[in-house]
C-alpha cells in the first residue's frame, strides 16, 4: 500500500464518553469522534482540533483514505459524518468507518468541470446546465478517486455528457440509481427562454373553480 491519496491524522483512545466528557474534550482543544464498522466494536477516540480542522479544510476528506494513528496503532478509515455547532460552525463530533481492504466501498466523488471558457456551445450562446455535481461509485479502498474531471471544451449546443462518456478506471463502478444519466448539457438560449416562459404562464394561470 502506498501513501498516495492517504491523509494521516493522529488520534487518542478515550475512556470517558457522554455529554459531559465530550464537552470537556472540546474545551481542552480536542474533538470527540467514533470509529464504527461491520463486525467490529466501535472505538471512541479524540482528535486534535487544530490538526483535524487544518486537514479538513485543505483536503476533501470524504474522498480520501485516512490513516488514523491511535496511540501508536494504525487504523484505515473513511470519514462518514462531521457534526458542527449550529451557531459557531465549530466541529463538534466526527464519525469514521473502519475499512477492510478486501471489501469494496461506496462513496460520492465530486465532479470538476474544466475548460468552461473554451466550451464551443457556450461561445455560441448556449446555456450550461450542470445536472450532477457528484458521482456515486463503488470501488476498492485502493482505487478511491478524489474527484473526476469533465472537460467541457468540445461540448456543443444541444448535446450532453453522460456517465457512459466518462473514462473511469476499470475497478471503479458507478452505482447511481438512474441508468446512464446526463451529467451536463448545453441548451440554446431560446430553449431556456421558452422553458422559463412556459413556467411563468403555468404559475400565473388561475385554477378553475368547481
Curated annotation (Swiss-Prot):
Keyword Lipid biosynthesis included in the entry's annotation: no
Gene Ontology terms: cellular component: cytosolic large ribosomal subunit
Residue ranges, annotated region (Disordered): 186-210
Keyword RNA-binding in record: yes
Xref: PANTHER family: RIBOSOMAL PROTEIN L25/GLN-TRNA SYNTHETASE, ANTI-CODON-BINDING DOMAIN-CONTAINING PROTEIN, RIBOSOMAL PROTEIN L25_GLN-TRNA SYNTHETASE, ANTI-CODON-BINDING DOMAIN-CONTAINING PROTEIN
Subunit: Part of the 50S ribosomal subunit; part of the 5S rRNA/L5/L18/L25 subcomplex. Contacts the 5S rRNA. Binds to the 5S rRNA independently of L5 and L18.
Name this polypeptide is given: Large ribosomal subunit protein bL25
Organism: Ehrlichia chaffeensis (strain ATCC CRL-10679 / Arkansas)
